[in-house]
């Protein structure tokens, strides 16, 4: 209703971060390439699994909220990489993205699989945290590689501690700046540079919407310094508390 009212008043509409579905009244969609997020996670998991990344492997996939369109795209991206390379023995969609729901899901997977898990595709850092809690409670040692997303502080620290393999960093500042520029151009009738979209569109169920899709970045222990620290997303003081001081030094965080 809000989008329709804006259209009726000749006000441009940008769908920011999440795609508004089933309306042709959008001017632009601006977000990160969410299928690419899932693909980054899938590729990172295969890398971390190494020689275990075979069809005999036991992988658990913990997706996001089934009502969230972004979660659907993350899932598609992950499957585009993992399908045919490993066997996803258990897969869950996690209501509300809640870590406690992910923990319950992982507990069920461990019970079903007899604690044999070679890798966990977790769609974000919250679900990763829930899955890790379940595995610790079950006494899974060593922890299998597990993915994440959002570069949450707790996840960065888990990566340093060796409990989580990776996260996906989405530079919020770059997204906000792109949205501000796009809003300015639309409001003042300035031609939007073709380089912003590079001809990309995303179908929302009603139309192909011109889309600005920013590039997500995989973060592992080796590039925390050059990504989230370099961008000021987290500082050394944030990350390197006493419990993580030696791990920070080893990872070259300054």
Where are these regions (language model features)?
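A residue-level marker of the well-folded mature domains of exported/periplasmic proteins
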Residues: 1-254
């Amino acid at each position: 209703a809000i989008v329709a009212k804006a259209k009726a008043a000749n006000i441009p509409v940008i769908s920011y971060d999440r795609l508004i579905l089933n309306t042709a009244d959008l001017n632009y969609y601006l977000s990160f390439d969410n299928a690419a997020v899932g693909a980054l996670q899938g590729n990172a998991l295969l890398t971390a699994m190494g020689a275990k990344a075979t069809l005999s492997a036991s992988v658990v996939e913990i997706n996001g909220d089934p009502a969230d369109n972004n979660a659907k795209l993350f899932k598609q991206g992950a499957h585009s990489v993992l399908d045919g390379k490993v066997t996803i023995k258990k897969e869950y969609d996690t209501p509300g993205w809640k870590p406690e729901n992910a923990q319950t899901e992982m507990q069920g997977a461990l019970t079903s699989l007899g604690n044999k898990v070679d890798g966990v595709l977790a769609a974000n850092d919250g679900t990763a945290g829930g899955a890790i809690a379940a595995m610790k409670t079950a006494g899974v040692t060593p922890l299998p590689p597990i993915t994440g997303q959002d570069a949450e502080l707790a996840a960065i620290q888990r990566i340093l501690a060796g409990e989580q393999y990776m996260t996906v960093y989405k530079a919020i500042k770059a997204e906000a700046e792109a949205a501000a520029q796009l809003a300015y151009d639309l409001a003042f009738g300035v031609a939007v540079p073709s380089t912003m979209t590079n001809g990309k569109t995303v179908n929302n169920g009603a139309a192909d919407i011109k889309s600005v899709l920013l590039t997500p970045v995989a973060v592992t222990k080796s590039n925390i310094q050059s990504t989230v620290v370099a961008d000021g997303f987290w500082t050394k003081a944030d990350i390197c508390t006493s419990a993580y001081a030696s791990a920070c030094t080893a990872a070259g965080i300054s």
